Amino acid sequence: MFEGVPDEDAWRNCTTLEGACELTARWLEGSLSYVPGYTAPQYAGENGPLSEALAAINRLGFLTDDSQPGKDVSGGNGQRAFVTGRCTEQAAAVISAVLVETDLVVLVFPPGEGGSGQICVTLDGEREFTWLGGSGGPSYAHETYTDWTNETLAKALKECWELQIFDPVWGRNAKLIPLLQKALITAKS
């Protein structure tokens, strides 16, 4: 799928969640230089194990659109590990069911619904810098993907469930990714 097609054309021709997940995985691995909504020519996050794990999560059917590793709070700076993205209703239900038995937090936004909460996940010099809990709802996904890809993919992603998953423990990285992968493997079986 999409072999030999220029990166932006691959996205313009992509029409499904599964295709978007595969293209995002390739971008995370560095074999694509373009992903919708991201203006840098390549993934600017943590390279190596984190980008590999995020690629695997995409290939399991969870279209990641934002993430960060955890960093211990020191000198007023710190991060909670998080991953946000979109998936099918079935995957959202399984992820929620698997992770509810852990101390990870899963915020779920069904298609057509937004949110306006604020949960701090990044401290910068003792001030809150990044938050989860808010969602642009279906119009955000539709506008973003219509502008950068095509109407068919935008409509498909508009029907997906949006999840924001984070570890409430500042600096911890050992739980979120493995448990999300476990939940997605369960959803696939």
Question: Could you tell me what each predicted segment is?
Answer:
Residues 86-93:
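Helix N-cap motif at beta-to-alpha junctions
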Residues 75-82, 115-119:
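Ankyrin-repeat boundary/"N-cap" motif
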Residues 13, 105-189:
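Active-site or metal-binding loop neighborhoods of secreted/extracellular toxin and effector enzymes
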Residues 44, 83-86:
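Short coil/turn segments at secondary-structure boundaries
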Residues 1-79:
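N-terminal low-complexity, intrinsically disordered segments
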Residues 61-67, 103-111:
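Short secondary-structure junctions
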Residues 93-103:
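Short, aromatic/basic amphipathic alpha-helical patches
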